[in-house]
Swiss-Prot record:
Annotated compartments: Secreted
Family from the record: Belongs to the glycosyl hydrolase 11 (cellulase G) family.
Protein name: Endo-1,4-beta-xylanase 1
Glycosylation sites: N25, N75, N167
Source organism superkingdom: Eukaryota
Record-linked Pfam families: Glyco_hydro_11
Matching PROSITE patterns: GH11_1, GH11_2, GH11_3
């Protein structure tokens, strides 16, 4: 089947403005919860002290909303299109311990992951905690494994050729840690992700992240699927 490893042109274009790790703007816009006829329009920004990123290609009926603190919700239907949204930080860094909790109920192809980008070199990365019907490990080259936060993860890489990114159309690598077994989707979910544990393991396998950090969020993604996600990050 076609892999769910897709790129988000509009999201990447919006993220370019944050590609250089500058001090965070202390003036935050109000929470984003605008609806349109096809759902919530794509947007990025800050909400209650957290960076958020939301992108949809418009093919699905999708509603994304930021709540208080690190909370966001996403409801999508129609089994069409691509979408991804979540809350976290911009810039990311390699020692953050991320807590998440909430509800994750995918129906079809979807991920719940720590997700982000670096530059120099350009790397897109995932730490996948749970997923729906499609295991991302099936479309990637396995490099090894690591135990982080009491769970085993498969470490994998893929390469994207001439694809959109936060730095324009590029060829770049994707780095993956995929929890094995995954956390069960379909209801309440929570966990802790020590990013440094994964990043150190990747480095030991020659998978080196870039020196400049872009955003780092806990994201819900969907591809030709439906579902509901309400996640709080801290």
């Amino acid at each position: 089947m076609v892999s769910f490893i897709f790129t988000r042109i509009i999201l990447f274009a919006a993220a370019i403005n944050g590609a250089v790790a500058l001090p965070m703007n202390t003036t935050e816009p109000e929470d984003f919860s605008i609806l349109s006829r096809s759902g919530t329009p794509s947007s990025t920004g800050y909400s209650n002290g957290y960076y958020y990123s939301w992108w949809t290609d418009g093919a699905a009926q999708a509603t994304y909303a930021n709540g208080g603190g690190g909370q966001y919700s996403l409801n999508w239907s129609g089994n069409n299109g691509n979408l991804v949204g979540g809350k976290g930080w911009n810039p990311g860094f390699n020692g953050r311990v991320i807590q998440y909790s909430g509800t994750y109920q995918p129906n079809g192809n979807s991920y719940l992951s720590v997700y982000g980008w670096t530059l120099n070199p350009l790397i897109e990365y995932y730490i996948v905690e749970s997923y729906g019907s499609y295991n991302p490990s099936s479309a990637a080259a396995r490099k090894g494994s690591v135990n982080c936060d009491g769970a085993n993860y498969d470490i994998l890489t893929t390469t994207r050729y001439n694809e959109p990114s936060i730095n324009g159309t590029q060829t770049f690598q994707q780095f993956w840690s995929v929890r094995n077994p995954k956390k069960n989707p379909g209801g309440s979910i929570s966990g802790s992700v020590s990013t440094g544990c994964h990043f150190t393991a990747w480095g030991n396998l020659g998978m080196n992240l870039g020196s400049t950090w872009n955003y780092q969020i806990v994201a819900t993604e969907g591809y030709q699927s439906s579902g509901f996600s309400s996640i709080t990050v801290a």
